[in-house]
């Protein structure tokens, strides 16, 4: 039976991302260096240390055995007749998503299990964070990769539940939320986006 494409939706609420229901997947943006040292990533590391170890090992794997994603960068200035499609090499895991299943060490003393989804949108962090245009391009690639993986996981009845997200990229990466939100809106999936109660719309 052929599946019909559905339009995704985003519901924005105020609260605590970590209050997501049992089985939910929590989405945040990550650097490719293996550090969850600041912002909401630091809270992820404290609450899900086993998931952090998987993320860190994933980054280290590509550090010592580099692999590259070849992607085309289509012209986005229609008034520029000289623009042409160019191929770009991106060093993994940049531009991809890592979906980490609930880890027993992270949920054994809690009443809820959470999946963790890492979107690799910046190569580095701090003063070496990627420029906003690169982060958004990586976000497009990473979200597309996440969507492919989620469709596969749901087909396998893996138990992955609702998709909950922070306003990723808008904190320490310094990218306006509206730009990342647009990428989610075009993904075809449904998301609950949580912002802290003290954060303005």
UniProtKB/Swiss-Prot annotation:
Cited SMART domains: A1pp
Parts of the chain that traverse the membrane: none
Gene3D superfamilies: Leucine Aminopeptidase, subunit E, domain 1
Positions of substrate binding: 15-17, 29-31, 36-41, 168-174
GO molecular function, one term: phosphoprotein phosphatase activity
SUPFAM superfamilies: Macro domain-like (SSF52949)
Keywords assigned: Hydrolase, Protein phosphatase
Pfam family name, one: Macro
Family: Belongs to the POA1 family.
Protein name: ADP-ribose 1''-phosphate phosphatase
